[in-house]
């Protein structure tokens, strides 16, 4: 079985900017508007994006369920169920799902986020019906042997120990995120807290499965060498046989109160290789922002913190030599709130106080004076180039549509994004900076390679 992982934010690509000019930001219809959409009688939403250059397809099924939908005290159950979905059904023996895909010449995997869980296969087009039948089968016919459940729970506990408990940077990231959200479940880790993972049961997994896994709570995305009507016919033949589930529940969530004071998290750990400085701000997501606001934040963080031409990098790395690296990003692909993140790795003999003061000075200048037209133009070119690049990749297209639709956006929202980016003004950028680079809505964290004050050095817990 392939390694399953909680989804992490990946670095944005910066490529083929020369393909675009400042004179025109519009994309062709072929790059920006290619999706067909329809819905089956049982409520399954289907998106098809043809790409006929090679006889292969990417098939993804997305569920409107993630770590933020878990009941209190059961963190990690969404990710746990993702693992268990690769066990067995009435038709497929334990551990055979991925082996069958491999024998068919394809590959598969899955991931869990706070708002989504997704399963995908890349396969030859003439195997699509087989894959759709397999995925439809495990949507309703999952079988869980208690021994397999307990074994997989141990696998996840070990995954957490190796990826989090033995990684000081991951510990700090988790602690910052928990401090950032005063009430909202985005503050709990997707993989779950260790003490809660250890108590997850077969019954807990089935409860989550029965609550969220149904055609009327799912989105099917198929990209590649296919015709929309052919996909519709195959979907009717496979997924269409599954009845909708009237018991699929809404997704009530704790709402975040107003943030009135900044918070700090300072972690000392002798296992840390180098000191590092971090800050996260709560921000609106593309779902909750006012029109144009998230687009402005995307562009703002491109100017402020992305790459060697960014304001923060130029100031703290290139000019003042205070850091060996620095950067940041805006993450707005969420159902509820988004996040702005910054980081810096201090140079030798540079203190966190110096780093923080320098970065705060850059942010204060941006808030007060905004950015230049040249900076805005470069940011637009870079983002639109990335959009074109991603549009040339089946898997990227499937993720673009699947993720956005699963958190509540529309095909129109997705395909008109380049036009909205092109319309962002300098005034929009300045307003976004003034509103959302608010220290009261932030958590600042530091990681120091040293023994914690008044405590023994941390060590990974013994495996039980």
Where are these regions (language model features)?
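His/Glu-based metal-binding/catalytic segments typifying zinc-dependent metallopeptidases
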Residues: 161, 178, 247-309
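Active/ligand-binding-proximal structured segments within catalytic/core domains
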Residues: 43, 53-101, 279, 291-304, ...
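Charge-rich, well-structured scaffold segments of protease-associated domains
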Residues: 2, 34, 39, 96-249, ...
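Short acidic-hydrophobic surface loop/beta-edge motif
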Residues: 36-41, 265-268
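Bacterial N-terminal signal peptides
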Residues: 10-25
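N-terminal secretory signal peptides that target proteins for export/translocation
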Residues: 1-8
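Boundary at the C-terminal end of the N-terminal hydrophobic targeting segment
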Residues: 26-33
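Peptidyl-prolyl cis-trans isomerase
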Residues: 50-53, 463
């Amino acid at each position: 079985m392939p390694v399953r992982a909680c989804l992490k934010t990946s670095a944005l690509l910066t490529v083929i900017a020369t393909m675009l000019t400042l004179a025109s930001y519009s994309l062709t219809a072929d790059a920006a508007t290619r999706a067909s959409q329809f819905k089956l009688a049982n409520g399954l939403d289907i998106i098809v994006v043809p790409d006929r250059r090679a006889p292969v397809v990417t098939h993804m099924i997305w569920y409107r369920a993630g770590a933020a939908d878990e009941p209190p005290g059961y963190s990690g159950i969404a990710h746990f169920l993702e693992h268990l979905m690769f066990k067995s059904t009435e038709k497929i023996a334990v551990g055979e799902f991925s082996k069958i895909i491999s024998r068919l010449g394809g590959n598969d995997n899955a991931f869990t986020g706070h708002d989504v869980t997704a399963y995908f296969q890349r396969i030859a087009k003439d195997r699509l019906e087989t894959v759709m039948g397999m995925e439809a089968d495990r949507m309703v016919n999952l079988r869980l042997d208690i021994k397999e459940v307990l074994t997989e729970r141990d696998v996840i506990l070990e995954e957490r120990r190796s990826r989090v408990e033995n990684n000081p940077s991951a510990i700090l990231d988790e602690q910052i995120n928990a401090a950032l959200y005063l009430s909202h479940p985005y503050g709990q880790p997707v993989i779950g807290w260790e003490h809660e993972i250890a108590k997850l049961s077969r019954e807990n997994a089935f409860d989550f499965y029965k609550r969220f896994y149904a055609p009327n709570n799912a989105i099917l995305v198929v990209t590649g060498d296919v015709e929309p009507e052919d996909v519709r016919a195959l979907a009717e033949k496979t997924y269409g046989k599954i009845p909708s589930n009237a018991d699929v529940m809404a997704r009530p969530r704790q709402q975040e109160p107003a943030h009135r004071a900044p918070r700090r998290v300072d972690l000392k750990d002798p296992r840390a290789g180098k000191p590092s400085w971090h800050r996260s701000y709560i921000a609106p997501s593309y779902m909750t922002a006012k029109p144009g606001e998230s687009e402005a934040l995307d562009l703002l963080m491109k100017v402020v913190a992305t790459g060697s031409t960014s304001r923060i990098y130029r100031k703290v790395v290139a000019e003042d030599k205070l850091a060996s690296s620095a950067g940041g990003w805006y993450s707005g692909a969420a159902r509820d709130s988004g996040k702005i993140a910054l980081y810096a790795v201090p140079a030798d003999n540079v203190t966190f106080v110096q780093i923080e003061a320098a970065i705060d000075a850059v942010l204060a200048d941006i808030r007060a004076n905004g950015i230049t037209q040249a900076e805005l133009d470069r940011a637009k070119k870079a983002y639109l180039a990335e959009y074109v690049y991603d549009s040339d990749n089946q898997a990227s297209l499937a993720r673009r549509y699947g993720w956005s639709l699963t958190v509540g956006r529309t095909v129109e929202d997705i395909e008109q994004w380049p036009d909205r980016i092109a319309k962002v003004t300098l005034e929009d950028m300045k307003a976004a900076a003034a509103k959302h680079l608010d220290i009261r809505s932030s958590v600042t964290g530091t990681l120091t390679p040293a023994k914690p004050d008044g405590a023994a050095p941390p060590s990974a817990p013994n495996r039980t």
